[in-house]
């Protein structure tokens, strides 16, 4: 996924920024890329030891981690209403996943991996916010994705994972993940974090199940369950409340 993303971005980067290769001398994007790589590593590994419902609950804690990082280290002026919005959105994620949720102790190791993935996702957005104020969008994107791909490649090599022989279908999925969730999804987050607190950006990620449900309803004619509807409603209310309180904070 990250390799193909870098592959797509490379021609543009080396054409437009071929005289600005000093970007590679900056150590800070290496750190952000490392955080992103750790997020993906722990997140994907978590599914080997726990189920989707448990993993979603713990990854949904990402906005809370981000809030704590901004509160403790960035002195971001976030009103209490933002925290209330986060808790509402977390409750919505819990409602959506309730049908696939098992006893946490049964899947403890996988749950801890998902929780760790949430923490590093928060670190990725938190550190990226300050860096985006100093580095142009496209070079930042390219550098972070490149370093993340290199670190993930190193992790795979250490684990003895082969880079070849996965079949046409799997490589097509990798391409799809690169074009959609990475180049559109993650890149949008990296653009937004330049203008919004990382907490608000990470909170918006919790809206993903809502979009997925709508697409499944439109394209696959899947029914929207009551728990999905109620959980989605809570998530939207939470995102709205956090955003409104953030705007009030920004007002003179």
Locate each region found by the language model.
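Hydrophobic transmembrane alpha-helices of multi-pass small-molecule transport proteins
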Residues: 9, 13, 36, 78-100, ...
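Transmembrane alpha-helical segments that form core, pore/gating elements
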Residues: 6-9, 66-68, 102-160, 174
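Cytoplasmic-side transmembrane-helix entry/capping segments in multi-pass membrane proteins
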Residues: 24-33, 78-90, 110-111, 135-145
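Hydrophobic/aromatic residues within transmembrane alpha-helices
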Residues: 1, 46, 72-74, 131, ...
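Specific alpha-helical transmembrane segments that line the substrate/conduction pathway
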Residues: 2-7, 35, 44-77, 117, ...
């Amino acid at each position: 996924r990250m390799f193909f993303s870098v592959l797509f971005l490379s021609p543009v980067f080396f054409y437009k920024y071929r005289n600005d290769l000093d970007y590679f001398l900056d150590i800070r994007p290496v750190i952000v890329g490392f955080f992103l790589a750790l997020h993906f590593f722990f997140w994907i590994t978590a599914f080997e030891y726990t189920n989707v419902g448990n993993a979603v609950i713990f990854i949904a804690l990402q906005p809370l981690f981000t809030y704590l990082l901004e509160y403790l280290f960035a002195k971001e002026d976030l009103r209490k209403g933002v925290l209330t919005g986060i808790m509402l959105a977390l409750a919505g994620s819990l409602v959506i996943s309730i049908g696939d949720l098992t006893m946490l102790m049964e899947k403890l190791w996988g749950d801890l991996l998902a929780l760790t993935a949430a923490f590093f996702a928060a670190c990725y957005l938190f550190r990226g916010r300050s860096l985006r104020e100093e580095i142009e969008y496209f070079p930042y994107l390219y550098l972070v994705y490149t370093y993340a791909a290199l670190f993930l490649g190193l992790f795979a090599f250490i684990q003895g994972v082969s880079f070849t022989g996965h079949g046409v279908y799997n490589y097509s999925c990798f391409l799809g993940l690169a074009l959609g969730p990475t180049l559109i999804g993650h890149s949008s987050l990296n653009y937004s974090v330049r203008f919004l607190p990382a907490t608000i950006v990470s909170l918006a990620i919790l809206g993903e199940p809502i979009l997925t449900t709508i697409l499944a309803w439109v394209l696959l004619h899947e029914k929207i369950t009551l728990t999905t509807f109620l959980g989605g409603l809570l998530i939207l209310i939470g995102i709205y409340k956090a955003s409104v309180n953030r705007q009030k904070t920004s007002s003179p």
